[in-house]
């Protein structure tokens, strides 16, 4: 990819760019956001928003809150570090929260089945395997419970199918 920039004069460092920022939107590959937070953002007092490839759990946590505009918009205002959930986690929150608001006294549980593509379009190095794979308790349920509460009656299954075209939620 460096060849794509051969006609440009590039100078400075990531730190010199960060010096002029109030907020960084970190879209680096999963796991790198935590390293960036510890090595760059925290030491320089820079706020950051992280992508869904990171985590808010355990010792690799990048943020205090998993953000979903339909669920916890106002709570994110004072946070220095926020994580935007994956597309599946965000979609579930946007669909389920209005149902919770309108029918909370009538709902006993939420069941969701995610039918997921095997690999994202840009993952050209990741082979689309001709098989179907089911995950009984994928991270999506735990992530959604981060903003609904750990005792939310949410039960999620994920099924990977051999395609790169879509995700589908059955709720």
Feature locations, PLM:
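Active-site-lining helix/loop region of Rossmann-like oxidoreductase modules
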Residues: 96-170
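N-terminal Rossmann-like NAD(P) cofactor-binding subdomain of oxidoreductases
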Residues: 1-121
């Amino acid at each position: 990819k460096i060849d794509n920039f051969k006609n440009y004069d590039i100078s400075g460092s990531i730190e010199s760019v960060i010096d002029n920022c109030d907020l960084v939107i970190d879209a680096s590959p999963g796991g790198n956001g935590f390293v960036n937070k510890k090595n760059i953002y925290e030491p320089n007092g820079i706020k950051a928003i992280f992508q869904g490839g990171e985590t808010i759990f355990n010792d690799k946590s990048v943020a205090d809150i998993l953000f979903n505009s339909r669920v916890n918009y106002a709570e994110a205002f004072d946070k220095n570090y926020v994580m935007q959930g994956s597309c599946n986690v965000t979609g579930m929150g946007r669909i389920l929260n209005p149902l919770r608001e309108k029918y909370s006294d009538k709902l006993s549980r939420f069941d969701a089945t995610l039918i997921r593509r095997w690999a994202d379009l840009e993952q050209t190095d990741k082979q689309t395997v001709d098989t179907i794979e089911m995950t009984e308790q994928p991270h999506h349920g735990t992530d959604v419970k981060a903003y609904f509460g750990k005792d939310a009656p949410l039960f999620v299954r994920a099924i990977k199918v051999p395609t790169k075209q879509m995700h589908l939620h059955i709720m």
